[in-house]
A protein has these predicted regions:
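Adenosine-phosphate binding glycine-rich loop
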Residues: 197-258, 398
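ATP-dependent small-molecule kinase phosphotransfer cores
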Residues: 290-348
Length: 419
């Protein structure tokens, strides 16, 4: 007997965590069902050969005519992201509304009396608008690339200093095109919070810039988990303890998917601690220097000797930009990786940055182009310590045995509230 089909339809699903989430909270198998063209989506919907599905970009509006019954909230929003097949009849719902409301609430973002700027005009825009409107927002502005209709151009939106909350509903900054950003939060002196519905990476460039401004910044991962839990209630017809399940699943999966990036002085034990930590956390270990050597075909001392430090830093930045896009890794970085702000931002996007500190006299300096010991090493430490402080989110004192260091690193990771 064929198993009932549960899954997610959308144009591109390579970035999706939905399968992991649904199979964590329910007992059905959940499939990712990419439908690159509208013709394929039309055929899929006409066949109705599924028990229940979620719907993502670009089909949240496309699927509405195929639903026999559309929930009033989904109808008013004009977007459906959850469809349940009950005896051949399709029922459409919108759980993104409750998911986004959860995200805002859990981070203390209150729309009442606020001026809100929403980036993008796609299907998620209408959902976010509804939540902001129902939350009592004073004014809701929209910005887009084209500025059509009532929307501002992004350049025009930058001249609204009264904006207090920004919500990104576009795919800008989403994997694999990380690093992209539509506006600069620094342009908004009254800014209090930035929310981004993008969930991969955990922190988009927009959110990293918002964090640098000292305002509340939250990505879409908790929204993703919340809407999945609410969708599961529709799928199964059972009420769940959402108040307990959503934060528990969010935290568990973030720990499973997060990277741990390790920085520190040359010879402080980054690779040794990193390899052991990766084993303990069941994550892939990446030694960034070894990866640079693998990709360039040259060892690092030779790169420094033959091409100079600037050339090495370019190789390092290129390799790191690709590696940091991944998930569930422990990344041991070279000692000078923090010299580039772009590098530290790449490390921050998917997890904590762990600064390994070790007494200067205990550093291993053999085969390291920039750390020869003595006065030069002291000077290097003095130059880099402020950079390590600025780049790191947690600090590990590596003064004892390897086992002690790894135990401490695991504890820091598991108790990191910023994760």
């Amino acid at each position: 007997m064929q198993q009932p089909l549960y899954g997610l339809i959308g144009g591109k699903l390579g970035h999706s965590y939905s399968k992991i989430i649904h199979e964590k909270i329910a007992d059905y198998t959940y499939e990712l069902l990419p439908l690159p063209t509208e013709a394929e989506a039309r055929t899929f919907m006409e066949r109705r050969a599924f028990a229940a599905i979620n719907v993502t970009i670009p089909y949240k509006q496309f699927v509405i005519p195929y639903c026999d019954v559309v929930d009033p909230k989904a109808q008013s929003i004009g977007a459906v992201n959850t469809i349940v097949n009950r005896d051949g009849k399709l029922y459409g719902y919108n759980t993104d509304y409750a998911g986004f409301a959860y995200l805002a609430g859990v981070h203390g973002v209150d729309f009442a009396g606020k001026t809100v700027l929403i980036l993008g005009t796609g299907g998620t825009h209408s959902t976010v608008t509804a939540v902001c409107r129902d939350g009592g927002a004073k004014e809701i502005l929209t910005a887009s690339r084209t500025g059509k209709g009532d929307a501002l151009l992004y350049s025009e939106a930058m001249h609204r200093p009264d904006v207090q909350i920004i919500v990104n509903t576009t795919p800008c900054g989403m994997f694999p095109n990380v690093g992209q950003c539509l506006i600069d939060p620094k342009a908004f002196p009254a800014l209090e919070a930035v929310l981004d519905v993008v969930y991969n990476p955990f922190r988009t460039e927009l959110l990293l810039r918002a964090e640098d401004c000292g305002v509340t910044a939250a990505g879409g991962f908790e929204m993703l988990v919340a809407q999945a839990v609410f969708a599961t209630e529709h799928f199964t017809g059972r009420q769940l303890d959402t108040a307990a399940i959503i934060p528990a699943v969010s935290r568990e999966l973030r720990h499973q998917l997060a990277n741990v990036s390790i920085i520190g002085m040359p010879g402080c034990g980054k690779s040794t601690v990193g390899a052991a930590l990766a084993k303990r956390l069941d994550k892939k270990f990446v030694d960034l220097d070894a990866e640079i050597e693998r990709r360039t075909g040259h060892n690092i001392p030779d790169i420094f000797a033959q091409e100079g430090e600037d050339a090495f830093r370019r190789y390092e930045a290129d390799v790191l930009a690709e590696v940091a896009k991944g998930n569930s890794q422990v990344i041991a970085c070279g000692g000078g990786v923090i010299k580039s702000p772009a590098n530290t931002r790449a490390l921050r996007q998917n997890g904590p940055v762990l600064w390994v500190r070790r007494p200067l006299e205990a550093l291993a300096t053999g085969g390291r182009p920039l750390s020869k010991g003595g006065a030069a090493l002291k000077q290097l430490e003095a130059e880099r310590t402020p950079l390590y402080e600025a780049a790191s989110t947690v600090v590990l004192e590596n003064n004892g045995s390897l086992g002690e260091a790894v135990d401490a690193a695991v504890k820091l990771f598991e108790t990191d509230e910023k994760l």
